[in-house]
């Protein structure tokens, strides 16, 4: 019997299958993909086509040092913001190193939308309103496809972002409101009405001062109809005055005051006074003036807000009345400023008080770079600028071309004198002293500034002296700021009677400006 062979034990191997791969992430919804593509495109990482497909972006000009320079003057930096027709970039002035904000406007878009006149009006308005609490327009440049607004860079962001964190202390809110009213008063005095005042259009600089921006919806006095009213429905719903909602004519200055009242309420309360999810219900509240002040509002503040948010524009408080209000006046300081060499210069009252206490004269302001005629001999002074042919032609009454280059509304006069330059300057200083004007001197130009703060700012007069011949000079006097009537009164009562003594009696202007031809 054959012996059975021993069999090895049976080994059973269990094969465990690999786990299934995880399902792919869900494809983004069309609107989400579109948002992501737009975001990546804006920050310079991806390109997008018309269908929203994204692809790695090729090197772009802003990253190229050569193409990052605008007009040879500014180096473009990061994108600060964008709208339908424009983008705003941080930039740096290559020469001075100063930061600026450059608003880049697409010409094709504004032409298709019929906004060319709108852009021209905004430029005109920004030239009119030169004030420490208003964002300053430095210059406007253009290419075939773009328009560039070179503006003051305000690094503190929107006031809206500050308020979004919570209501402000009363003293802080008061200071912002004072600065707002100061700037709005100046605008109204210059015939400019903002019509879209809101915290989003109020910026803060690095020193915590307010700057009014975005004059895109502004109106100027020349736009008003024969009834003197605006008829355009515009603005942001929560800040619109009730009379604007009626779609009838309204006084733009009074509508701005209403918006200032809403802003003050927002600063103090942390929310708008007429809020409702339903915009039509909100409009009804605005029209009826239905709002409630929080319990922490002082009685003086409540009285002021009641006047500001008066639904009747005829009885609503005015800017001059606001400036006399007890709550408003607390700690208020009139901002003093002047424009020199196209640069806005500000004077703080505290600095003036220190200067007065140190023995300096408050009538004549000087610096190391300025020329003091009384201390320097006339022989050591540089000669005044000589007039070129274009200057001489433009000085002639029949060929006055200054209107092509100067800001609208600049009144002026000129005369020829044979008196020594030192005598002319001394006479202008003497006139300024009589009426307590401040005098600023720089070479052969003087600036006389009144101390009274009018609706259009202090009266400012510039006088420049030009050499016509070795023995004759032309003295040109112009109003640079302030009220026209005040300027005419000053000229008729003070300036002309005194300067007539210096006019060269034997030479009339046209004869002095006579140019012989080459054939004579």
Curated annotation (Swiss-Prot):
Cysteine disulfide partners in this protein: none
Gene Ontology biological process terms in this record: signal transduction
Region span, Disordered: 1-29, 48-67, 349-368
An annotated Gene Ontology molecular function: ATP binding
InterPro entries: Kinase-like_dom_sf, NAF/FISL_domain, NAF_dom, Prot_kinase_dom, Protein_kinase_ATP_BS, Ser/Thr_kinase_AS
EC number: 2.7.11.1
Entry comment, domain topic: The activation loop within the kinase domain is the target of phosphorylation/activation by upstream protein kinases. The PPI motif mediates the interaction with the ABI (abscisic acid-insensitive) phosphatases.
Function: CIPK serine-threonine protein kinases interact with CBL proteins. Binding of a CBL protein to the regulatory NAF domain of CIPK protein lead to the activation of the kinase in a calcium-dependent manner.
Protein's name in the database: CBL-interacting serine/threonine-protein kinase 18
Annotated source species: Arabidopsis thaliana (Mouse-ear cress)
């Amino acid at each position: 019997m054959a012996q059975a062979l021993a069999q090895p034990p049976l080994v059973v191997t269990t094969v465990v299958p690999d786990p299934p791969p995880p399902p792919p992430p869900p494809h983004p919804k069309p609107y989400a993909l579109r948002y992501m593509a737009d975001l990546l495109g804006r920050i310079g990482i991806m390109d997008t086509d018309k269908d929203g497909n994204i692809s790695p972006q090729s090197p772009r000009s802003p990253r190229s040092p050569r193409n990052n320079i605008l007009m040879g003057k500014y180096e473009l930096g990061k994108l600060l913001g964008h709208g339908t027709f424009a983008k705003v970039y941080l930039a740096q002035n290559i020469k001075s190193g100063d930061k600026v904000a450059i608003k880049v406007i697409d010409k094709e878009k504004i032409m298709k939308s019929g906004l060319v006149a709108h852009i021209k009006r905004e430029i005109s308005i920004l030239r009119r309103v030169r004030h420490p609490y208003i964002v300053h327009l430095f210059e406007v440049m253009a290419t075939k496809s773009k328009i560039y607004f070179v503006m003051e860079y305000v690094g503190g962001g929107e006031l809206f972002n500050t308020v979004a964190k919570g209501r402000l202390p009363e003293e802080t809110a008061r200071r912002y409101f004072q600065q707002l009213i100061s700037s709005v008063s100046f605008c109204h005095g210059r015939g400019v009405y903002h019509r879209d005042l809101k915290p989003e259009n109020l910026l803060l600089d690095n020193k915590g001062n307010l700057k009014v921006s975005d004059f895109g919806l502004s109106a100027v006095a020349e736009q008003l109809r024969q009834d003197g009213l605006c008829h355009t429905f515009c603005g942001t719903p929560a800040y619109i005055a009730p009379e604007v909602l009626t779609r009838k004519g309204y006084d733009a200055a009074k509508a701005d005051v209403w918006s200032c009242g809403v802003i003050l309420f927002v600063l103090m309360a942390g929310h708008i006074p007429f809020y409702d999810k339903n915009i039509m219900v909100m409009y009804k509240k605005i029209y009826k003036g239905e709002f409630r002040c929080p319990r922490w509002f002082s009685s003086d503040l409540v009285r002021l807000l009641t006047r500001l948010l008066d639904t009747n524009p005829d009885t609503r408080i005015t800017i001059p009345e606001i400036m006399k209000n007890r709550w408003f006046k607390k700690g208020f300081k009139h901002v003093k400023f002047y424009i020199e060499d196209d640069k806005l210069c500000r004077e703080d009252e505290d600095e003036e008080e220190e200067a007065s206490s140190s023995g300096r004269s408050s009538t004549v302001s000087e610096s190391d770079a300025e020329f003091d005629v009384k201390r320097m001999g006339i022989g050591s002074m540089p000669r005044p600028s000589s007039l070129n042919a274009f200057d001489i032609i433009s000085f002639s009454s029949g060929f006055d071309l200054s209107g092509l280059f100067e800001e609208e509304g600049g009144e002026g006069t000129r005369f020829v004198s044979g008196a020594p330059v030192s005598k002319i300057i001394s006479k202008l200083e003497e006139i300024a002293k009589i009426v307590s004007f401040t005098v600023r001197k720089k070479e052969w130009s003087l600036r006389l500034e009144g101390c009274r703060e009018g609706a259009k700012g202090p009266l400012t007069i510039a006088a420049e002296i030009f050499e016509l011949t070795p023995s004759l000079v032309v003295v040109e006097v112009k109003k640079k700021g302030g009220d026209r009537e005040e300027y005419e009164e000053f000229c008729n009562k003070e300036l002309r009677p005194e300067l007539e003594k210096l006019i060269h009696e034997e030479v009339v202007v046209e004869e002095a400006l006579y140019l012989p031809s080459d054939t004579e």
